[in-house]
UniProtKB/Swiss-Prot annotation:
GO terms for cellular component: cytoplasm; small ribosomal subunit. GO terms for molecular function: rRNA binding; structural constituent of ribosome. HAMAP family: Ribosomal_uS19. It comes from Borreliella burgdorferi (strain ATCC 35210 / DSM 4680 / CIP 102532 / B31). Keywords: Ribonucleoprotein, Ribosomal protein, RNA-binding, rRNA-binding. GO terms for biological process: ribosomal small subunit assembly; translation. Belongs to the universal ribosomal protein uS19 family. This is Small ribosomal subunit protein uS19.
Amino acid sequence: MARSIKKGPFIEKSLYQKVLSSFGSEKRVVIKTYSRSSTIIPEMVSLTISVYNGKTFIPIYITEDLVGHKLGEFSPTRIFRGHAKSDKKGRK
C-alpha cells in the first residue's frame, strides 16, 4: 500500500539536516546513512549518499530519475551467486 499524500514522503530527520547543510556548501561531501527507508527527495539531486547494506556503505549518486524511490532499493543486502550446477544432465 502506498503512503498517504497528506503525510508526505518519509525522510529521517538527521539525514534531512545533513542534506540541507550540504546543499549550501560547494564542497562535494559524501553523506553516510543507515536509513534505507528514507525516500529520495528533489533536494538530494546531485548529491552522493552512501547507504549501509549491513556490511559496507554503498555510494549512490542521486539523479532526477531516482526521486521518489527509497534509498534501500539501490543498495542490495544479498548476493546471488547462481544455482549449483547439477551433473545429472550429462549422465544416462
